[in-house]
């Protein structure tokens, strides 16, 4: 039977015909090559995810150690600067947070009505936006920012209705659609709980 199997010829697009054994060996080699490529990709992803995990862990520890809201916002901004960004900002919807007296954090307030056209235009049904903002849009979310080339913007909270977190870069091509948003997503979920230490939810 073994000799009979070896004698079987299989059509081959380049070599005309090959033996069944050769054909199976070639398939096995190809399969191993695909597995090796997949394994390399998985390793790359694991290393990238580990990097994201440690960045997030460092940020969480730093923000948890803050002595005030201003200290927390400064630590958040510094963390972004350490990553080579221009900065990081938070804007909160006043119908979800008590931003007036006595806490007096009105500078964080973002009118939902003012933000809505930008949200529809840039985010649509998505929770994150990566790319440029035009002048009027920047005035809505980052009125004091200068030389912003591109932003990574994410809606805060699991229901995406508490406010916005923004990372800014002076480089217009730094943030682009199609880039990964895993770290952004985790930060947007983590921040509201940390903010509740200093600001009461409505």
Predicted regions and their residues:
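Signal-transducing coupling segments at domain and membrane junctions
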Residues: 126-150
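Allosteric regulatory "coupling" segments in signal-transduction proteins
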Residues: 97-128
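Regulatory loop-to-helix N-cap segments in sensory/regulatory domains
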Residues: 169-185, 195-202
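Signal-transmission linkers at sensory-effector interfaces
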Residues: 13-62
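A short, aliphatic-rich beta-strand micro-motif
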Residues: 149-157
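Helix-loop-beta substructure at the N-terminus of cytosolic sensory domains
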Residues: 65-106
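Short hydrophobic/glycine-rich mini-motifs in sensory/regulatory modules
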Residues: 156-166, 171
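Short, positively charged
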Residues: 1-12
């Amino acid at each position: 039977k073994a000799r009979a199997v070896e004698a079987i010829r299989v059509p081959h697009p380049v070599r005309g015909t090959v033996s069944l054994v050769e054909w199976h060996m070639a398939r096995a080699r190809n399969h191993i090559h695909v597995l090796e490529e997949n394994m390399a990709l998985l390793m790359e992803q694991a290393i990238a995810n580990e990097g994201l995990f440690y960045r997030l862990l460092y940020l969480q520890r730093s923000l948890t150690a803050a002595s005030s809201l201003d200290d927390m916002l400064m630590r958040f901004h510094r963390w972004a600067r350490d990553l080579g960004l221009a900065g990081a900002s938070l804007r909160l919807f006043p119908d979800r947070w008590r931003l007036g007296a006595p806490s007096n954090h009105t500078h964080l307030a973002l009118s939902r009505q003012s933000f809505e056209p930008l949200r529809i235009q840039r985010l649509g049904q998505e929770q994150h936006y990566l790319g440029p903002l035009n002048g009027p849009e920047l005035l809505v979310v980052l009125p004091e920012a200068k030389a912003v080339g591109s932003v990574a913007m994410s809606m805060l909270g699991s229901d995406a209705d508490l406010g916005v977190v923004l990372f800014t870069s002076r480089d217009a091509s730094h943030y682009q659609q199609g880039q990964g948003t895993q770290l952004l997503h985790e930060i947007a979920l983590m921040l509201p709980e940390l903010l509740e230490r200093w600001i009461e939810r409505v």
